[in-house]
Swiss-Prot record:
Transmembrane segments: none annotated. GO terms for biological process: L-tryptophan biosynthetic process. It is an enzyme of class 5 (isomerase). GO terms for molecular function: phosphoribosylanthranilate isomerase activity. Its EC number is 5.3.1.24. This is N-(5'-phosphoribosyl)anthranilate isomerase. PANTHER family: N-(5'-PHOSPHORIBOSYL)ANTHRANILATE ISOMERASE. It comes from the Bacteria. Pathway: Amino-acid biosynthesis; L-tryptophan biosynthesis; L-tryptophan from chorismate: step 3/5.
C-alpha cells in the first residue's frame, strides 16, 4: 500500500480529519513557513492523536535548524519522526535522535541517475535507513510550493529505491501520478488546501483517490 502524508497541519481538527482518512503520517511544520506552528500547538495535536488506534505518525518538519533544536522540539512535542527539508548533511542526519525523512530537492535539469547517486550516498553514510522524500527545488521555499517536477524521474528512481514524493500533487492529478510513477509514498500540503487553509473534504478525497489508484494498479 502507498504511504500517505498530509503535511502542514495547523489545527487539531485538521489532524483528526487526517487520522480518520487512514493517512500514515501527519506533518507539522517548525521551519520558516506560512504553515509554521508553535510547540504548544504541536503538542496539542500530539495529545489529540495519541489515544487513536490506529493513528498517523506525527512528523515534525525542519529546515537548516541545529540538531540540538530539532531533538529538543521532537522530545517536547512527542514527535514520531523528523523530516529534514533543508540542506542538512548526512553527518547532520546522524545527530537526530528520531527516524528521519530526508528531503532530496529535485531541481530543473536533475536526472534520475543523480537522485539515485544521492540516495546511495545517504545509505552509505547514515547509521539508520531514512525515508527519502523527493520534492521540487524552489529558491524561496523548502516545500509546500505546489510545484511539480518530472514524474519520469520518480518512475526511474522507484525501480531501484522506495521513495516518497511531494510537489504539485492534488486530488485531480494524484491517480495519474501513481499510474506513472509508482512511488512508495506521497506527501501533500497545498494540494489539499482552499485559500491556504487545510480543507478536510479535499484531504478525504485525496486519500480516497490514492487508495483507489493503489488498489487498481498492477505492480
Amino acid at each position: 500500500m502507498i504511504k500517505t502524508k498530509i503535511c502542514g497541519l495547523t489545527e487539531v481538527g485538521q489532524a483528526l480529519a487526517t487520522a480518520r482518512t487512514g493517512a500514515d503520517f501527519a506533518g507539522v511544520v517548525f521551519a520558516e513557513s506560512k504553515r509554521r506552528i508553535t510547540t504548544e500547538k504541536a503538542l496539542e495535536i500530539a495529545e489529540a492523536l495519541k489515544p487513536l488506534n490506529p493513528r498517523p505518525m506525527l512528523v515534525g518538519v525542519f529546515a537548516n535548524q541545529t540538531a540540538e533544536e530539532v531533538n529538543r522540539i521532537a522530545s517536547v512535542c512527542r514527535l514520531d519522526r523528523v523530516q529534514l527539508s533543508g540542506n542538512e548533511s548526512w553527518e547532520y542526519c546522524n545527530q537526530v535522535n528520531l527516524p528521519v525523512i530526508k528531503v532530496i530537492h529535485v531541481a530543473e535539469g536533475t536526472t534520475a541517475e543523480l537522485v539515485i547517486q544521492e540516495i546511495q550516498a545517504g545509505l552509505k553514510a547514515l547509521k539508520k535507513t531514512p525515508v527519502f522524500l523527493l520534492d521540487t527545488h524552489t529558491k524561496a521555499l523548502f516545500g509546500g510550493s505546489g510545484q511539480s517536477f518530472d514524474w519520469q524521474i520518480v518512475k526511474q528512481v522507484s525501480l531501484k529505491y522506495p521513495v516518497m514524493v511531494a510537489g504539485g500533487l492534488n486530488p485531480e492529478n494524484i491517480q495519474g501520478f501513481i499510474k506513472i510513477a509508482k512511488p512508495w509514498g506521497i506527501d501533500v500540503a497545498s494540494g489539499v488546501e482552499t485559500d491556504g487553509i487545510k480543507d478536510t473534504a479535499k484531504i478525504h478525497l485525496f486519500i480516497e483517490r490514492v487508495k483507489d489508484a493503489d488498489g487498481n494498479r498492477i505492480c
